[in-house]
Regions:
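Alpha-helical transmembrane segments of multi-pass membrane transport and lipid-handling proteins
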Residues: 81-110, 163-167, 189, 288-338, ...
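Transmembrane helical elements of multi-pass membrane transporters/channels
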Residues: 8-23, 154, 176-191, 195, ...
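Membrane-interface junctions at transmembrane-helix termini in multi-pass inner-membrane proteins
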Residues: 67, 127-150, 199, 332-363, ...
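Membrane-proximal transmembrane or re-entrant/amphipathic helices at the cytosolic face
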Residues: 409, 430-471
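Signature of the first transmembrane helix
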Residues: 4-61, 90-99, 124, 155, ...
Length: 471
């Protein structure tokens, strides 16, 4: 793994690290501005936008990623156009549906009728679609510094707009929703202007709209199932316990989102690098095995530290959201297992074996729904967190299993699973008990165990990177 590769990773990630610092400032302020109920409403609106985006995109954003490097550079604008063609058509249909069913949508979210909700959803859909592809363009061109710039700009603008709209709306969901909308709008417009060459849609693509859709549509179904897996928890919490618990759950996710920023930094860097590496040498496995090892070590250490620091969440979120500190521990597994799985599963995409994505998505979606239906009525948001955390471990295991069926990777899984057992027990303890001394002691023991189990990996990383040696 060469120094230039690491430089590229840190260039992609630097925006995430700055965003974490911004988040540490903005999250405590935001949670003190809004009650859990209003936070919950904003979260449900965001959830609906994400659902509709799955329908609108038809998986063609993934098609753009898959065929980007196989397309001639001068024709990538046309590839972008072909990937946007069907989503734009579907977007207009969805907009008509939102207008027609606006009363039902408003009743579901607010328990009263407000056409304003329909306008917000329409605006957010338009700019979220444009933002997804404008971000992908920068990401696939591997313009790391520009990507980091927009990551930071989005966070800064979002925070500033929250402060602005709070003066107008006070404790109201509109404060967060409008801040998200306007920050997305500005960064999208700027990124399209900067990348105007590819957005001119020029050239003759090697791939037809039908060919792109044929590849992407199965992924769209998989992504829909993945959404059910990832988001059914909030819907079930709303049905069984109400907006207060949704707000608590969403606040706990705000803490996890700070880890997810690092996750996004890695996955943004990793996907194009991995595809490029595979296209040059499909038989190369050592590179992927080493990345798996290093990423596992980093995220396990980070996860144990976050769990050990759980009591700081009370200070961070404020007394109103104190229950979120009991929800957060099991949610830690979401970014950890997702990120580690990204290092093992890309071969499924390489080999175009999308049926495995479908099998995985159906399995984990069903498991999470069953887990939530059993645990949420009894434990509320904590039950949803337990279900999600456990199912994400299954998610990682299945992704890795099918990947290793396609290529004979030699991932060192035993030591990862050993640490996961102890981390899972630790997280469950923190979900139900809050003894400060035991929290710290158990956390330190877990960190020591990680360092012992991964000692050979730590030594290897030291000599390769600290000593500035290359593979």
């Amino acid at each position: 793994m060469k120094k230039t590769l690491l430089n590229k990773f840190f260039s992609f990630s630097i925006g995430g690290y700055i965003s974490i610092l911004i988040g540490l400032i903005s999250v405590p302020i935001t949670t003190r501005m809004l009650t859990p109920e209003q936070y919950g409403i904003a979260s449900i609106i965001s959830l609906i936008v994400n659902i509709l985006m799955l329908i609108v995109s038809l998986g063609l954003d993934q098609g753009f990623v898959r065929f980007f490097y196989e397309e001639k550079e001068e024709a990538r604008g046309k590839l972008l156009f072909n990937c946007l063609y069907y989503p734009i058509f579907i977007l207009f249909v969805i907009i008509l549906g939102i207008i027609f069913f606006n009363k039902n949508i408003s009743e579901f979210i607010l328990k009263k009728q407000e056409f304003y909700i329909a306008l917000i959803l329409i605006a957010m859909l338009i700019f979220t679609l444009a933002n997804r592809f404008s971000t992908l363009v920068i990401r696939m061109e591997q313009k790391a510094k520009l990507f980091s710039f927009f990551t930071v700009l989005t966070q800064v603008l979002n925070f500033l707009f929250i402060l602005l709209f709070f003066k107008i709306y006070k404790d109201n969901y509109k404060t967060i929703v409008l801040a998200t909308l306007f920050s997305t709008m500005i960064t999208t417009i700027l990124s399209v202007i900067i990348e105007k060459k590819i957005w001119s849609f020029k050239g003759e693509s090697n791939f037809t709209k039908r060919e792109l859709l044929k590849f992407s549509l199965p992924l769209s179904l998989t992504m829909a199932l993945t959404w059910i897996f990832q988001s059914s928890d909030k819907i079930i919490i709303k049905i069984f316990t109400g907006m207060y618990e949704v707000g608590i759950y969403s606040a706990a996710f705000k803490i996890i989102a700070l880890i997810s920023i690092i996750q996004n930094g890695f996955t943004t860097f990793w996907a194009p690098v991995a595809y490029e590496k595979y296209s040059k040498n499909p038989s190369e496995t050592l590179f992927f095995e080493k990345v798996f090892e290093y990423v596992s070590l980093f995220f396990l250490v980070l996860g144990a530290f976050i769990l050990m620091s759980k009591n700081l969440i009370i200070l961070l979120l404020g007394e109103t959201y104190v229950e979120a500190s009991k929800v957060m521990p099991m949610l830690v597994f979401i970014p950890i297992m997702y990120t580690i799985s990204e290092t093992t599963m890309l071969v499924i995409g390489f080999k175009k074996q999308t049926k495995y994505f479908l099998i995985i998505s159906i399995t984990v979606a069903l498991l999470n729904i069953i887990g939530n239906l059993i645990l949420v009525p009894v434990l509320g948001a904590k039950g949803a967190a337990i279900s999600s955390g456990c199912v994400y471990i299954v998610f990682f295991a299945m992704r890795t299993y099918y990947s290793m069926k396609l290529i004979n990777f030699k991932f060192k899984l035993k030591k990862l699973y050993l640490i996961l057992v102890f981390m899972l027990l630790y997280a469950l303890y923190l979900t139900f008990y809050n003894n400060f001394l035991y929290t710290i002691v158990f956390g330190i023991i877990l960190e020591i165990l990680i360092f012992i189990v991964y000692l050979s990996t730590i030594k290897e990383m030291y000599f390769k990177f600290i000593k500035k040696r290359e593979i």
